[in-house]
Amino acid sequence: MSRIGKRPIPIPAGVQVELTPDNVVRVTGPKGQLELRLHPKMIVQRENGVVQVQRPSDERFFKQLHGLYRTLIANMVQGVTEGFRKDLEIHGVGYRAALEGKTLVLTVGYSHPVRIDPPPGISFIVESPTRIGVVGIDKQLVGEVAAQIRRVRPPEPYQGKGIRYAGEVIRRKAGKTGKTKGKK
């Protein structure tokens, strides 16, 4: 039995989990609604305020799906109650971020400002010109948008300039050493 897959998912107050006959799990909560289509043979049961994921057999494929689906459903429940947030930091002289309406505008050393429109369900928070927050209810989409922002100007290893995740450690490299005069 999968150690992760066998753990029940508690359903908090104000959250509704709906299981359709065509194996779609729909989670609705105060922040919105998320859907997940499951493999047709996987079994999801809801009873006594918890959701339990079960697999049809002990085949390797179903063992893999067991823990995955349990975690995805748990993330959906957490997303519609608390939401998810990924923070980014901007390092570099003159590098900054700003919001124009809902659009994120990045000035990161290019000849033009880079504009990023949020996909549906995602919003940006600019706490300071060097800190960006990506907020939403879908964990995968939040991470994807944060990675897309980081990709605009990834941190470089010599001076550390660029956009990085909050708390991310960048491995630094030593620069070139100069030639000594007189010796050949």
Swiss-Prot record:
Q: Which domain of life is it from?
A: Bacteria
- Name a single GO biological process: cytoplasmic translation
What the entry lists under InterPro entries is as follows:
Ribosomal_uL6-like, Ribosomal_uL6-like_a/b-dom_sf, Ribosomal_uL6_a/b-dom, Ribosomal_uL6_bac-type
List UniProt keywords, sorted A-Z. Answer: Ribonucleoprotein, Ribosomal protein, RNA-binding, rRNA-binding
Q: Name one Pfam family in it.
A: Ribosomal_L6
Gene Ontology MF term list: rRNA binding; structural constituent of ribosome
Q: Which GO terms describe its cellular component?
A: cytosolic large ribosomal subunit
What subunit structure does UniProt give? Part of the 50S ribosomal subunit.
Per its database record, what is this protein's job? This protein binds to the 23S rRNA, and is important in its secondary structure. It is located near the subunit interface in the base of the L7/L12 stalk, and near the tRNA binding site of the peptidyltransferase center.
- What family does the Swiss-Prot or TrEMBL record give for this protein? Belongs to the universal ribosomal protein uL6 family.
Return the protein name: Large ribosomal subunit protein uL6
Organism equals Thermomicrobium roseum (strain ATCC 27502 / DSM 5159 / P-2)
